[in-house]
């Protein structure tokens, strides 16, 4: 197989990233929840004060092969803050196209996010996974992550739409 490059996403990658976001949502059986547009990704990730950062995985052609590189995965992350431990990084999405899974590409993306976290002085690297995604759970544990639901009993909550407007009195 040709080599894999993990690099920072560029604004021009947003179309491919959005396609993979939709593929991930379909895999997670949550396609109806994707409301983001390519324009929003450009504005939110590549403006003056980006809300997120993104890494992409590309398969580079072997020397002499006629085709160009092929984007096969991504990891979208942002920085958060813990009142207990300070700077943290949160991996919102990690996705590798099905035909490229099992080749270590997801691990390479995760390791690169860990590098970024350490370079930025983060004390923790957080992520969430659906309970039925056993392969991902096993991968994260193999890489050294602790399952906080098992270890500490945390539940994750979300306010959205009408509940958020009602809460804010708007």
UniProtKB/Swiss-Prot annotation:
EC primary class: transferase
| Protein residues bound to acetyl-CoA | 94-96, 102-107, 133-135, 140
Q: Which reaction does it catalyse?
A: S-(2-aminoethyl)-L-cysteine + acetyl-CoA = S-(2-acetamidoethyl)-L-cysteine + CoA + H(+); an alkane-alpha,omega-diamine + acetyl-CoA = an N-acetylalkane-alpha,omega-diamine + CoA + H(+)
Record-listed substrate binding positions: 27-28, 92, 152
| Segment forming the signal sequence | none
State whether keyword Transferase applies: yes
Question: What domain of life is recorded for the organism?
Answer: Eukaryota
Q: Which UniProt keywords apply?
A: Acetylation, Acyltransferase, Cytoplasm, Transferase
EC code: 2.3.1.-, 2.3.1.57
The UniProt record lists the keyword Transferase: yes
> Which CDD domains does the record cross-reference, listed alphabetically?
NAT_SF
The cross-references to InterPro entries, in alphabetical order and at most eight, read: Acyl_CoA_acyltransferase (IPR016181), Diverse_Substrate_AcTransf (IPR051016), GNAT_dom (IPR000182)
Indicate where this protein resides in the cell: Cytoplasm
Instruction: Please report the stretch or stretches of sequence annotated as the N-acetyltransferase domain.
Output: 4-166
PANTHER family attached here?
DIAMINE N-ACETYLTRANSFERASE (PTHR10545), THIALYSINE N-EPSILON-ACETYLTRANSFERASE (PTHR10545:SF51)
Q: How does it assemble?
A: Homodimer.
The protein in question is named Thialysine N-epsilon-acetyltransferase
Source organism (scientific name): Sus scrofa
Per the record, the gene is SAT2
